[in-house]
Regions:
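Juxtamembrane extramembrane loops of integral membrane proteins
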Residues: 1-155, 159-162, 180
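Acidic, S/T/G-rich, low-cysteine, solvent-exposed domains in lumenal/extracellular/periplasmic regions
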Residues: 79, 90, 106-362
Length: 362
């Protein structure tokens, strides 16, 4: 049996805050009069000894109006409740290997992402360091995981490491790649006012090419972009800040072509690279795509913060939609087929079992 309890938040706001059910402000316009109301858009599911809080108000981008946010939240209600029920009713069954050793993001940088994943899956750190001395053992250990997460590596992969990941994929393991193919960081730009954006060599171009995609070493600028906050002067001893559109940070609306990306709000990407698709037997589904108002910037190239003051010329933002996130599905052909592999496996494959790969170029 399912029991429903509706609570007036005004009667016990302090207790709700202690549970993490934070209120939101809603602007209401009635008969020309604008007022502000405080709402607590949350639901709590309790099952056996477990409790799951469900946010009913979807997060929005800077360019999303309140009306659009509310409409998106209403459309997302069914998904929110189903997701909450799955978290609390079904036990964790699958596991994710969080790869380290190639300069990936550290735990602090991945904290929010991994915290959310940890509600659904078992997580474990995994390094490919031992692949040069014990490749078969490394692959066997990696095969214990259902998915390998590679988050922003900055050190090139060796052929031995690539071969292990290749065979892992062909044996049915799934992979999620979050790749920065261009070195361009806002921190150094904020200090100096400019920065040299240059290509990052991860030794993966041939790897992905054999699977049917090419991640370019460029940056996609988009007129549909997020804003960055910059200091514009001082008032007394107080620094003034102002928000500026920053076309190197596209605001991407995920496609509804696959359940992975359906009903997601706008996603901010930073200095993403365009992904090209190549003809082969692998099924490809675009998950993240820019608007049609884009300009591709090749690398190496200087990026200057003063560009925020320049009005964009629509005539040069005409390079069309660019793929920034993609899902590959099917029976992959080994990236080492018809090549001499760095070592031999007892169960080496050239054609794989059905598997999946997601690549996001940020």
């Amino acid at each position: 049996n399912i029991s429903f309890v509706f609570v007036n938040p005004e009667k016990d706001m302090q207790r709700l805050l202690q549970k993490g059910l934070t209120p939101s402000r809603l602007t209401v316009k009635k008969k020309g009069v604008v007022s502000e109301s405080v709402i607590v858009p949350w639901a709590t599911i309790q099952y056996q000894n477990k409790i799951e809080n469900i946010s009913l108000l979807k997060e929005s981008s800077q360019t999303t109006s309140q009306e659009e946010q509310l409409l998106n939240s209403i459309q997302n209600l069914e998904f929110s409740f189903i997701d909450g029920l799955k978290k609390i009713v079904f036990p964790k069954k699958k596991s994710i290997a969080v790869l380290t050793g190639n300069g990936e993001l550290d735990d602090l940088q991945l904290y929010s992402f991994l915290k959310d994943l940890g509600r659904h899956y078992h997580l474990g750190k995994f390094t490919l360091d031992s692949v040069s001395t014990a490749p078969q053992k490394t692959l066997n250990q990696l095969d214990n995981y259902d998915l390998a997460l590679v988050a922003k590596p900055s050190i090139a992969f060796s052929e031995q490491e690539k071969f292990v990941l290749d065979q892992y994929l062909l044996q049915g393991g799934k992979t999620l790649w979050l790749l920065d193919h261009v070195v361009a960081e806002m921190d150094s730009m904020s200090q100096k006012g400019s920065s040299l954006a240059f290509s990052r060599n991860l030794n993966l171009d041939d790897f992905f090419f054999r699977y049917g995609i090419r991640v370019n070493h460029n940056m996609v600028k988009d007129l549909y972009a997020a804003k960055i906050s910059l200091a514009t002067g001082n008032t007394g001893n107080r620094t003034n800040y102002e928000n500026f559109l920053w076309y190197y940070h596209p605001l991407v609306t995920p496609s509804n072509r696959h359940p992975v990306s359906i009903n997601l709000g706008s996603i901010k990407l930073q200095f993403p690279s365009a992904i090209d698709t190549l003809a082969n037997a692998i099924q490809k589904t675009i998950l993240l795509e820019s608007s049609s108002l884009t300009k591709v910037v090749e690398t190496p190239n200087f990026i200057e913060l003063k560009a925020v003051n320049e009005l964009p010329d629509p005539k040069i933002f005409r390079q069309g939609k660019k793929t920034l996130g993609i899902l590959l599905e099917g029976n992959f052909t080994s990236a080492y087929k018809d090549r001499v592999p760095p070592f031999e496996f007892s169960d080496k494959r050239e054609t794989g079992l059905p598997s999946k790969m997601i690549l996001i170029s940020d």
